[in-house]
Amino acid sequence: MYRVPADQATPAQITEMQQRLLDWPQLQRYRGENVALTPVAPGTKRVVFYGDSITEGWGRTGSERFFPGKPYVNRGISGQTTAQMLLRFQQDVIALKPALVVILAGTNDIAGNTGPTTQAMIEDNLHAMVELAQAHNIRIVLASVLPVSDYPWQPGVQPAGKVTALNRVLRAYAEEQGLVYLDYHTAMTNKDGGLDPELAADGVHPTPAGYAKMVPLAEAAIALAQGR
């Protein structure tokens, strides 16, 4: 997410911004990888992790570190909001025929990455994703938004309270729908409602230690959802 005047942007930044304008939901991002993905083996339960940079960064160091030996697929895209994620849900989740999807989204909406957004708008987009998954018999783990007390690229938003409020309704919605709620927030938040530096150096994106804290929480939620 670039916040620089056009005359100060590098050629690479300008090219990326142009590509993002032409493909707003970034439907091209995983198209090749989706085609190359091997079919689900009999008896195997594929899990798609679906989200933004927090999800994408989890697998950035290579699949050998992204839940090694597990049939888990990473479909995170940096900077995305729930509106963008909803538009690519068919090709990046449903078409992959997973048994389960882990949805982690909302923080970029609060940051205003694609313009002003209300909590109701975030809820609507997440509800739509859940309903699409349910219509295709895909089990759902709905994750809390991670703690954040400030966005480096959008200072002054004061997101901590907004994140807490959103997580409150996400938990209630998960209970109402019979979904597994994956609570990263409670396990990771500090006294300021954010992430300590050892968990996220920039206050938003987890460090290896941050992801290490998330792994057992995610695994437990997946096991619970698959057992239902």
Each predicted region: which residue ranges?
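Alpha-helical cap/lid subdomain in secreted, periplasmic
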Residues: 64-71, 80, 86-228
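Catalytic nucleophile-elbow at a beta strand-turn-alpha helix junction centered on a G-D-S/GDSL motif
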Residues: 44-60, 78-81
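Short, flexible loop segments at the rims of nucleotide/cofactor-binding pockets, characterized by
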Residues: 22-27, 77-81, 159
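Short linear sequence motifs
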Residues: 17, 23, 43, 51, ...
